[in-house]
């Protein structure tokens, strides 16, 4: 079977990670998601918690000044160094063989590959709020605002590192609505498209 890579970007709590995992299982290829955090924690200066919070999300405003002013001798912030290490790891994972990579600007980092299927997963707000509750995530008084804030931070992170709008249709080969089709159907569509690459 030919070497191919799937990238899955997703709205927070849209079941994108689940869909990526299901598609990878159907295709018999690895899915790289939270293991990316573990690999980076082992191979870089960064703690796992820092990677989890800063590997896909722009910093909170209260931490912005600290991170802007905390630059090394090359002028890079910790988040810049993390992005560079993460991008290098994504290129290594893609070079090793067929796989699914979730988030982390992967479709941008791997944009020069001709064997790439770029997917975006979204869901309606009610489904995302339900998913938030299923995952027992403390969203405070406003789950909807929590989800909007998480997506806004992803969007800001993506733009800061790519100069491209996160979620814009032109950046993906297909966008799927998981609340309309369900996780299994979305995964099946991805697997079918992968086989046609």
Model feature map: region roles:
Residues 30-41:
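Short beta-strand-centered segment that lines the nucleotide-binding/catalytic pocket of NTP-utilizing
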Residues 89-136:
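ATP-dependent NMP and nucleoside kinases share a basic, alpha-helical "lid"
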Residues 1-6, 65-76, 83-84, 88-91, ...:
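Domain-scale detector for complete catalytic domains at protein termini or as standalone homologs
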Residues 58-67, 139-184:
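Small-molecule kinase domains that catalyze NTP-dependent phosphoryl transfer to phosphate-bearing small molecules
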Residues 87, 183-191:
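Short, amphipathic alpha-helical "lid/cap" segments that border enzyme active or binding sites
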Residues 8-24:
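Glycine-rich phosphate-binding P-loop
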Residues 2-11, 97:
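Pre-Walker A (Motif I) flank of P-loop NTPase domains
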Residues 41-98:
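ATP-dependent small-molecule kinase phosphotransfer cores
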């Amino acid at each position: 079977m030919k070497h191919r890579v799937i990238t899955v970007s997703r709205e927070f709590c849209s079941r994108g990670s689940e869909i990526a995992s299901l598609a990878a299982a159907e295709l018999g290829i690895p899915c790289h998601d939270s293991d990316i955090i573990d690999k980076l924690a082992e191979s870089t200066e960064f703690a796992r918690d820092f990677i989890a919070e800063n590997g896909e999300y722009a910093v909170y405003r209260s931490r912005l000044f600290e991170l802007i002013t905390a630059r090394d001798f090359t002028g890079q912030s910790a988040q810049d160094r993390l992005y560079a290490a993460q991008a290098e790891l994504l290129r290594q994972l893609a070079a090793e063989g067929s796989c699914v990579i979730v988030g982390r600007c992967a479709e941008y980092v791997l944009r020069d590959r001709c064997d790439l299927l770029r997917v975006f997963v979204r869901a309606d707000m009610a489904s995302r709020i339900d998913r938030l509750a299923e995952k027992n995530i403390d969203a405070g008084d406003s789950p909807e605002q929590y989800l909007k804030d998480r997506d806004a931070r992803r969007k800001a992170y993506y733009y800061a590192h790519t100069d491209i709008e996160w979620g814009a249709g032109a950046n993906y080969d297909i966008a799927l609505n998981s609340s309309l089709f369900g996780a299994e159907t979305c995964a099946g569509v991805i697997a079918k498209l992968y086989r046609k690459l």
